[in-house]
Amino acid sequence: MCSLEKRDRLFILKLTGDGEHRLNPTLLDSLRSTINQIRSDPSFSQSVLITTSDGKFFSNGYDLALAESNPSLSVVMDAKLRSLVADLISLPMPTIAAVTGHASAAGCILAMSHDYVLMRRDRGFLYMSELDIELIVPAWFMAVIRGKIGSPAARRDVMLTAAKVTADVGVKMGIVDSAYGSAAETVEAAIKLGEEIVQRGGDGHVYGKMRESLLREVLIHTIGEYESGSSVVRSTGSKL
């Protein structure tokens, strides 16, 4: 599932175990519960969230085998991930994804839903695989892609050629902020970046509101109509 460690003002959320970290209802509920736990901490608005993982996968996307065995669960998983992404966007603190393995499809969307993406260069790629497996991408995935990938050419390559984007290529495309030689170096760099952000100070609530406005299209697709200045904390559980 996932674990949470607090180091001073840093919250380190880790997807644990050596599996593929498929986004099934249980894991998604665990991630949302952990985000809610962070929100309840008295220091949360002066903190930084770092999300990383064990093993060779950051996340290999939705649990497609589970969805095939029970098609109704595909709708449940999509709704739960939409709510998780909205949680991250509304979280009143900066967020960093330390991508130490493959991040595919919904797993790629999860990584890109963070403010910063740091990635190891010796293993792993960002991969929107839907074209290759002949699945139509949900409209809200496209909203995330538009909000997070500025270059039309990069969006084309990611979505319409199903490019497997390594860390160094991701830096050139503007998707990845920086690349590192190993998983350990990637996490260390994320911690260093988080500490630098904390040292700069700032009000997490103001930061979160600015992020909500910046990613307004994503919020409209994930939680419905959104008005700048309104709070999106968090009634979306009723939609699942």
From Swiss-Prot:
The keyword Isomerase belongs to this UniProt entry's keyword annotation: yes
Top-rank lineage group of the source organism: Eukaryota
Protein function: Able to isomerize both 3-cis and 3-trans double bonds into the 2-trans form in a range of enoyl-CoA species. Essential for the beta oxidation of unsaturated fatty acids.
Site label Important for catalytic activity, positions: 130
InterPro entries: ClpP/crotonase-like_dom_sf, Enoyl-CoA_hydra/iso
Keywords carried by this UniProt record: Fatty acid metabolism, Isomerase, Lipid metabolism, Peroxisome
Catalyzed reactions per annotation: a (3Z)-enoyl-CoA = a 4-saturated (2E)-enoyl-CoA; a (3E)-enoyl-CoA = a 4-saturated (2E)-enoyl-CoA
Any one GO molecular function term: delta(3)-delta(2)-enoyl-CoA isomerase activity
Protein name in the entry: Enoyl-CoA delta isomerase 1, peroxisomal
Pathway in which this enzyme or protein is active: Lipid metabolism; fatty acid beta-oxidation
Alphabetical GO biological process terms: fatty acid beta-oxidation; fatty acid catabolic process
Motif Microbody targeting signal per record, residues: 238-240
Coiled-coil residues: none
Major place of residence: other
Any one of the GO CC terms: peroxisome
Species of origin: Arabidopsis thaliana
Family: Belongs to the enoyl-CoA hydratase/isomerase family.
Enzyme Commission (EC) number: 5.3.3.8
Subcellular location, record wording: Peroxisome
